[in-house]
């Protein structure tokens, strides 16, 4: 059985036991949360709606992404860095 969940304007195909990195969620560590499922597939039949239970494992920053801008013939350079927050979750169960 697997489900499609949506969090942070992104969709993920998950099954029980999966560990995902999603955009930052406002929950603490070891907290159990319910995420809405767009659809659930079980034994070849598709059901729309439902809930997916997950556990928050940690919240941290991702790797640094460097943004480099260079304007030719202007002697202008800019180097910026960005680290996005993410939440690591574990899928506990997929509800009906």
Curated annotation (Swiss-Prot):
<dbReference type="InterPro" id="IPR001787">
    <property type="entry name" value="Ribosomal_bL21"/>
</dbReference>
<protein>
    <recommendedName>
        <fullName>Large ribosomal subunit protein bL21</fullName>
    </recommendedName>
</protein>
<dbReference type="GO" id="GO:0005840">
    <property type="term" value="C:ribosome"/>
</dbReference>
<dbReference type="Pfam" id="PF00829">
    <property type="entry name" value="Ribosomal_L21p"/>
</dbReference>
<keyword id="KW-0694">RNA-binding</keyword>
<dbReference type="GO" id="GO:0005737">
    <property type="term" value="C:cytoplasm"/>
</dbReference>
<dbReference type="GO" id="GO:0003735">
    <property type="term" value="F:structural constituent of ribosome"/>
</dbReference>
<dbReference type="GO" id="GO:1990904">
    <property type="term" value="C:ribonucleoprotein complex"/>
</dbReference>
<keyword id="KW-0699">rRNA-binding</keyword>
<dbReference type="GO" id="GO:0019843">
    <property type="term" value="F:rRNA binding"/>
</dbReference>
<keyword id="KW-0687">Ribonucleoprotein</keyword>
<dbReference type="InterPro" id="IPR028909">
    <property type="entry name" value="bL21-like"/>
</dbReference>
<comment type="subunit">
    <text>Part of the 50S ribosomal subunit. Contacts protein L20.</text>
</comment>
<dbReference type="InterPro" id="IPR036164">
    <property type="entry name" value="bL21-like_sf"/>
</dbReference>
<dbReference type="GO" id="GO:0006412">
    <property type="term" value="P:translation"/>
</dbReference>
<dbReference type="InterPro" id="IPR018258">
    <property type="entry name" value="Ribosomal_bL21_CS"/>
</dbReference>
<comment type="function">
    <text>This protein binds to 23S rRNA in the presence of protein L20.</text>
</comment>
<keyword id="KW-0689">Ribosomal protein</keyword>
<comment type="similarity">
    <text>Belongs to the bacterial ribosomal protein bL21 family.</text>
</comment>
């Amino acid at each position: 059985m697997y489900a499609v969940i949506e969090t942070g304007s992104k969709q993920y195909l998950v099954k029980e036991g999966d560990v995902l990195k999603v955009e930052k969620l406002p929950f603490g560590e070891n907290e159990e949360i319910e995420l809405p499922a767009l659809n659930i597939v079980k034994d070849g039949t598709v059901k729309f709606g439902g809930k997916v239970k997950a556990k928050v494992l940690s919240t941290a920053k991702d790797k640094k992404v460097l943004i480099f801008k260079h304007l030719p013939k202007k002697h202008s350079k800019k180097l910026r860095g960005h680290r996005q927050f993410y939440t690591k979750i574990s899928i506990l169960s997929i509800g009906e």
